[in-house]
Curated annotation (Swiss-Prot):
InterPro entries found in the cross-reference section: NADH_DH_suC (IPR010218), NADH_quin_OxRdtase_su_C/D-like (IPR037232), NADH_UbQ_OxRdtase_30kDa_su (IPR001268), NADH_UbQ_OxRdtase_CS (IPR020396)
Alphabetized PANTHER family for the sequence: NADH DEHYDROGENASE [UBIQUINONE] IRON-SULFUR PROTEIN 3, MITOCHONDRIAL, NADH DEHYDROGENASE UBIQUINONE IRON-SULFUR PROTEIN 3
Subunit architecture: Complex I is composed of about 45 different subunits. This is a component of the iron-sulfur (IP) fragment of the enzyme.
Organism this protein belongs to: Patellifolia webbiana (Patellaria webbiana)
GO cellular-component term (any): mitochondrial inner membrane
GO molecular function: NADH dehydrogenase (ubiquinone) activity
Family: Belongs to the complex I 30 kDa subunit family.
Protein name in UniProt: NADH dehydrogenase [ubiquinone] iron-sulfur protein 3
Length: 192
């Protein structure tokens, strides 16, 4: 079975309310779904005889601040039986919680923690939803587009106190003007 057959079969078999949009391309096939049907759709893709997407490769987050549902969560799946890949996408806002898929794919625990830590997207029924890449006292979610580049606090080791301290960031210069014109590219009109 080839990738296009699996994709077409899935589209024809699935309840239409589970899938908002489909996209076929040479880079891979994609289903867009509502958060309400995410778990059911992943169950179908993993357990059905003609799909068998039993490997969850990755879960990624993307932030689009101009959208109403600004966060996109992307699930990349692999069927080793049929040598096929598929991408499943859903979107959420700051308060929408997405169903955890740890019961279906145990490895999802780490990736869901990463998406929560970096973007603030929360997962319902996750067994251990806590920070994974940032410190426990860290405030905010650093991969959001509205997170300041310099962060909110500076964490450093204080040698006299022999401990790690967190202090508010103090900028010595609030605004910097960068001249992007290269002096090497300036030419006067007399050169031939």
């Amino acid at each position: 079975m080839d990738n296009q057959f699996i994709f077409k079969y899935s589209w024809e078999t699935l309840p239409k309310k589970w899938v908002k949009k489909i996209e076929k391309s040479e880079h891979g096939n994609r289903f867009d779904t509502n958060t309400d049907y995410l778990f059911q759709l992943l169950c179908f893709l993993k357990l059905h005889t003609y799909t068998r997407f039993q490997v969850l490769i990755d879960i990624c987050g993307v932030d689009y601040p101009s959208r109403k549902r600004r966060f996109e969560v992307v699930y990349n799946l692999l069927s080793t039986r049929y040598n096929s890949r598929i991408r499943l996408q859903t979107s959420a806002d700051e308060v929408t919680r997405i169903s955890s898929v740890v019961r279906l794919f145990p490895s999802a625990g780490w990736w869901e923690r990463e998406v929560w830590d970096m973007f603030g997207v929360s997962f319902i029924n996750h067994p251990d939803l806590r920070r994974i890449l940032t410190d426990y006292g860290f405030e905010g979610h650093p991969l959001r587009k509205d997170f300041p580049l310099s962060g909110y606090v500076e964490v450093r080791y204080d040698d006299p106190e022999k401990r790690v301290v967190s202090e508010p960031i103090e900028m010595t210069q609030e605004f910097r003007y960068f001249d992007f014109a290269s002096p090497w590219e300036q030419r006067n009109g007399n050169e031939g």
